[in-house]
Amino acid sequence: MKVAFIINDLQSMDLKKDTSIFLAKEAFDRGYEVHTFNTNNLSVQEERLTAQTSKLTFPTKDQLSFNLSDNGTEDLSEFTHVINRVNPPFNKDYLYMTLLLDAYGVPCINPTKALREINEKLSILKFPEIIPSTRVTASLQTIKDMFNQGFESLVIKPLDGMGGRSIFLVHKDDKNLAVIWETITGRGKHLVIVQEYIPEAESGDNRIVIINGELLEQKLVRVPSPLDFRGNLAAGATSKVEKVTNDDKKIAQHILPFLKEHNIYFAGADILGGKLSELNITSPTCLQEINNASDINPSEVFWDGLGDS
């Protein structure tokens, strides 16, 4: 099997946590030919979509350290799978990349059409019965109205962020509300998502993982640091692995038809207090953490589901 990973920040990865390298290592150990390229390496030549790729090899059996070697130009139609691991926020080059991959029928995980059309913050609006009270707005008054309706605390997020970046927790009568609104919306120029604060977040944000339509039996619980409300590892949260609960399974059953409809092979869902807060399909993470603290190897589950075609 010949596979490629689209990764824009390969050299800056944290090998102890990175999911992309974890998946690539398993592919290499299975004898697959593993390549990598970034969004700027694409070209259309003589009716072919090509990329300047590097071969990815792992010299040590039990470590994720890797070697890169320039490989030259590859026709992307020759790859069995192309794994898109580009992190948000996205720019026009990312959009053009997805359009090219679609136009030339390159087999991508997850499908580029889904990545282009499904926003991770907005997609939860399809499941109103299982999400926190949520608004999408650029209006300061709409945020104030939520407080007037009885909410004591709100979380405000950009629509294109990741890793807890630029997320604000605001409280009723917060004197910083206006300046937070100015900062995150550009004085009303950009839409944001506003959600009721879930107090159970203090005990941890639950990341469940769905691969090939199946929920992993273990989840990652990310507990915020005492100095930060965000349950993101990139924001200093700590983590532990636990068995998924019946509530987790119910939420998975709610979103599975949506994932199948859009041919989404690999997804992560974030759950707070029994409610779905985000649905990550762009570049889901946390596989290494689950692998290291349980008897489940998610990278094996990932590649087993794709077979050896």
PLM feature segments, named:
Residues 87-89, 159-161, 284:
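Short glycine-rich anion-binding loops that position phosphate/pyrophosphate groups of nucleotides
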Residues 141, 150-152, 163-249, 259:
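Phosphate-binding site of ATP-dependent enzymes
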Residues 1-4:
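Extreme N-terminal starter segment of soluble prokaryotic enzymes
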Residues 7, 12-16, 243-309:
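ATP-dependent carboxylate activation and anion-phosphoryl transfer catalytic cores
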Residues 6, 84-86, 158:
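Short, well-ordered coil/turn residues at beta-beta hairpins
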Residues 131-151:
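Rossmann-like NAD(P)H-binding beta-loop-alpha module
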Residues 11-12, 17-136:
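Conserved N-proximal alpha/beta basic substrate-recognition cap immediately N-terminal to
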